[in-house]
């Protein structure tokens, strides 16, 4: 374990919906990689307790997906609130990356950041203002080199840790097939 300002912080959230004004975070996970995308450590995977009235706001897609994955049951049984999840996640990150240095990394990470800003501002402040958004590369590939997209498939479990692992693998794939860096 070594703090390094070149390490990257990967985050994924699962939420009760897409609107941070009306929906809540129900799971958070994080991974730290080095600059070459090698996984250095997996952070805590935390289901965040939400009351039944918040879970009832989920649409059919969220309800089915998060029930079938077991996440709804984990949320109902969880003893973690948002503050405890923030504290545990920051304690993990502090071992690997100084505050304010790493961009927030992930797939469609702007959406996750909106939720962090609204519901976990202390954690959101831990990241640099920049993003490494794998979905941006996917959208550019779709337009400029669509044949590349056929070579990478996601399982799509919609569990936070699985999603981060897939995002890292996807970026490695794009690095190999698109970038000559």
Curated annotation (Swiss-Prot):
Top EC class for this record: hydrolase
Active site per database record: 129
Keyword Nuclease included in the entry's annotation: yes
Single GO cellular component term: cytoplasm
InterPro entries: Exonuclease_RNaseT/DNA_pol3, Oligoribonuclease, RNaseH-like_sf, RNaseH_sf
Residues of the Exonuclease domain: 8-171
The UniProt record lists the keyword 4Fe-4S: no
A molecular-function term among this protein's GO annotations: 3'-5'-RNA exonuclease activity
Name of a matching Pfam family: RNase_T
Enzyme Commission (EC) number: 3.1.15.-
Family note: Belongs to the oligoribonuclease family.
Name listed for the protein in its UniProt record: Oligoribonuclease
Lineage: Bacteria, Pseudomonadati, Pseudomonadota, Gammaproteobacteria, Vibrionales
Record gene name: orn
